[in-house]
């Protein structure tokens, strides 16, 4: 069953187009290494919660929009191999990110329902 690596970040709203281009480049890179697809979603209807929400989780500023994305892999072993290749590839360190990557969070997820 496919394995998912999900990401949440806060992106300056003014950088939407730069982020879209960055995501396209990253998606091509992930796919070259073994991912099957990348999905990037720009926050459109994201409510603020009393206890927690996308804004609090990323320490968003007033001029930032939450982004939710995921990379799909054929399996966890492929995801692990891709992450290893990425950690060894110095070209990724030079990729300019149009957001504060320190406030991004991510994790790997095993699918339990896929309909």
Residue ranges and their predicted role:
Residues 31, 35-62, 91-115:
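Glycine-rich beta-strand-turn "strand-cap" elements at beta-sheet edges
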């Amino acid at each position: 069953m496919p394995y998912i690596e999900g990401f949440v970040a806060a992106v300056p709203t003014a950088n939407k187009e730069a982020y879209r281009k960055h995501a396209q480049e990253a998606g091509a890179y992930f796919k070259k290494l073994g991912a099957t697809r990348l999905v990037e979603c720009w926050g459109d209807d994201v409510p603020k919660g009393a206890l927690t929400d996308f804004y609090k989780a990323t320490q968003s500023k007033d001029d930032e929009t939450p982004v939710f994305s995921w990379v799909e892999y054929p399996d966890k072993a492929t995801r692990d191999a891709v992450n290893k290749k990425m950690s060894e590839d110095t070209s990724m360190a030079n990729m300019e990110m149009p957001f504060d990557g320190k406030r991004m969070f991510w994790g790997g997820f095993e699918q339990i329902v896929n309909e």
